C-alpha cells in the first residue's frame, strides 16, 4: 500500500512538472503557434510573465544615475549584490544579478542614448562607457518551481525617448557577426545606431574592452555551463532602446549557437519580451528572425506611442508577434496625456495589467493587482484624485549627504556600483 501511494505521488508530481513545462513553452512563444490564441484576450499566465520581465527591465531605469551634474552619470547607482532588492522589485529574490553590462558606441548617437557627466561634474567614472543593463539567473526556489533555470538579460532603455526619436537617423548597415544570410534570406541589415551600441568596444575604456555583445554572450555561456545538468531558458527583455538591443541580442544568441550546449547539442529556447520597441532591421532581418527555430519575440506596443513606428516601415520591418495595449482606456490615467506618458514603461505595465483586448469595444480592468503609484514613478500620468506626486522616484536629497564635518557632499552611488 505504501509503495502504491509513493508511486502515485511521484506520478502526480511528474505529470504536474510536465504540464508546467508544456505551459511554459506555450506562454514563452516556444510552441509552433508562437502565442496564437494567447494575446486577445490576454492569457493570465502570459500577462504575469510580461509584467515580471517588464519589471526586470524597469530596474535598469530605476538604478541609472541620469543627472549630468554627477561624476557617475550613466552608471548604476547600486552594486550587483542584492540589486533587485535595492530597486524595490516586487519579487527581489526571484533572480540574482551575475553581471553588469556596459556599452559604448563608435558612431554619433542622440545624447539621450547615453547620459554622461557634464564637464563641470569633475573626474568622470568614464568618458566613453555607459551602464546598459545586467544578466541575472533564477534563484534555486524559482527554478525548482518552474522546472527550469531561467537566464535573463535586461537591457536599459532611455528616459527621454521622445527627444531621441525625432533625432534618429535611418541608416541601415549589414548585421555582420550578429546574423548572416541563410535559407530564404540574404544578408540582413539593421539600424546603425542600435548595432553600434551592441557591438562597439573601446580599448581605452576598462568597461568596454569587450563590447556589450561580447559581455552578454560570455556570461550566457558561463551560466549554461554552470547549470549544464538543468533545463534552462534564456529570456531577453528591454524597453525602448533596450527593446531594440533585446531584439539584436536574441537572434544573435540563436543564429550563432550560443544557446547550444554540451555534447547533446540540444538548443536552449530563447524568448525576447520587447516593450515599446522601435523597428530594428530590414525585410531580410525580418525573414531571418521569423524563420529561426528556438527563437520567439513578443513586442508589446501601446497604441498611441510614437516610438515603435518612428522608423519608416518602407525600410524597417516589425519582427515577432505583437501585443497591442492602449493606456488611453485606463480610467486611472490622465486623458489626454502625451508622448512621454504613452512611452513610459510603468504606464506600459499598467496597461498590460488591465488590458481586456484590442478591439474597439474592449474595456480595461486591473486583473493584476499592481500598485497604481508605480505609474507616476517617472512621469505625471495618474489622475490627481489618487494623490500620488509626479516623478516621485528620486534619490533622497538628490544624493547629497552630510559628512562628518557637517558639510553636504554628493554621494549618489554605493561602493561596488561599477562592478563588471
Curated annotation (Swiss-Prot):
Stretches of the chain forming a coiled coil according to its record? 367-388
In terms of superkingdom, the source organism counts as Eukaryota
Q: Where in the cell is it found?
A: Secreted
Q: Does the keyword Lipid metabolism apply?
A: yes
Can you provide one Gene Ontology molecular function annotated for this UniProt record?
phospholipase A1 activity
Give each disulfide bond as a residue pair.
none
Q: Which InterPro entries does the annotation name?
A: AB_hydrolase_fold, Fungal_lipase-type, PLA
Which Pfam families did the record assign? Lipase_3
Q: Which GO terms describe its biological process?
A: lipid catabolic process
According to its UniProt record, the EC number is: 3.1.1.-
Tell me the active site: 240 (acyl-ester intermediate), 240 (charge relay system), 305 (charge relay system), 343 (charge relay system)
Its Gene Ontology cellular component terms are:
extracellular region
The UniProt keywords, alphabetically, are:
Coiled coil, Glycoprotein, Hydrolase, Lipid degradation, Lipid metabolism, Secreted, Signal
Q: Does the keyword Lipid metabolism apply?
A: yes
Q: Where is the signal peptide?
A: 1-21
| Positions glycosylated per UniProt | 231, 294, 403
Report the function annotation for this chain.
Acylhydrolase that catalyzes the hydrolysis of phospholipids at the sn-1 position.
Family stated for the protein in its record: Belongs to the AB hydrolase superfamily. Lipase family.
Name of this chain's protein = Phospholipase A1-II 3
- Species this protein is from: Oryza sativa subsp. japonica (Rice)
